[in-house]
Amino acid sequence: MRERWITVDGNEAVARVAHRTNEVIAIYPITPSSAMGELADEYSTQGRQNLWGVVPTVVEMQSEGGAAGAVHGALQAGSLTTTFTSSQGLLLMIPNLYKIAGELTPFCLHVAARTVATHALSIFGDHSDVMACRQTG
């Protein structure tokens, strides 16, 4: 069997893996993770199946907090679930992250690490967003 190689950026690589390994994907666009959600939505629209032969349900929410709430609800219903976020969006998910961890419910949160803007918009990469929520479990 001949290997097939493709060149993709980090967002597309994450979207491909997330789409193949989840049943529900809750999204809300925030730079630089927007492309992950857009690609996952595109894959489901095209009818691409995950590893279990099911087309994942992609739900665009009204906010990052809504996306985190949708993840929590889907996890409680027994679905393999994920979302994509970064920066201030991740900070808005912190209350739900505590709830999810406190209920010992595992899931994978895909974070495109970005500076948390303190006084003006910042698109620079660092880990201040991830470090702000590392204690959530």
Please provide the spans of the model-predicted regions.
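Thiamine diphosphate
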Residues: 1-135
